Amino acid sequence: MEEVETAEEQLAKQHRKEKKDLQAKIQSMKNAVPKNDKKRRKQLTEDIAKLEAELSQKHENELKLQNTSSVEEVSDALDSMSVANHEEQSDPSKQSRTSKAQKRRDKKAALEKEREMRIAEAEVENLSGSRHQEGLKLREKLVERHLQIKEISSDGHCMYRAVEHQLTERGLALGLKELRDQTAQYMRSHADDFMPFLTNPNTGDMYTAEEFEKYCSDVADTAAWGGQLELKALSQVLQLPIEVIQADSPCITIGEEYDKPKITLIYMRHAYGLGEHYNSVEPLKDLANEEEG
């Protein structure tokens, strides 16, 4: 029979995965900034430190919450045992009526209620946090355009999935794999436009031909996160301008030479614990409903 992981083991496993994911994310961020670009390198160092601090704080809070829950669980269990023993001593007939299974169910229900209360409290505290404030600013910008955020899953493919969603809305059938393949192929065939922006994280030197090929292979065949370099390639492949809306910075447009309707993406720095994420946009629901009516 398989051993069931304890809550502590599950949390430790989750934390290890999140740390590993963060390191992969940081590596991707470093690769996208040239070594000789001191201004962007300085900003990158600050961004990485912030991401690491946020993840560390998140893990610390989760450990505190788990430890608190564990203490309360033991306390509740002892209280329940004390009450049960007293009742059983005063009325032995209750021993048969109150089963151990029922006690476990009651204890679990009480613990779950406590957990839900803590989550609710955390949500209230988060209203003043970076993620919430970023969301408010983006919504304000989008409402002016009669748009709203279209959530895209955070799986490493978010940028490509957001572009895929935009293309689908235009009746263009280009899937995730095809977008990745075409992006990688364009970068391979225009290596001089991309290699100066990619450096080996260990040496700081510009990528060799072999390292660049590995990078392109990852673009095509893995869930490697896509950034501005990949957006540049996608804009050229699709021959469409790509606009990126951000909360605290002006919008940027890649591929302005193409006089066609823009693909619009949302760039979010605080959407998830691991940092950057891309979402798509869709018509504002209330406006869409009015037009349909």
UniProtKB/Swiss-Prot annotation:
Residues 1-43, 57-114 are annotated as: Disordered. InterPro entries: OTU_dom, OTU_OTUD6, Papain-like_cys_pep_sf, Peptidase_C85-like. SUPFAM superfamilies: Cysteine proteinases. Residues 219-229 are annotated as: Variable-loop. Keywords: Hydrolase, Protease, Thiol protease, Ubl conjugation pathway. Its EC number is 3.4.19.12. The keyword Ligase does not apply. GO terms for biological process: antiviral innate immune response; protein deubiquitination; proteolysis. This is Deubiquitinase OTUD6B.
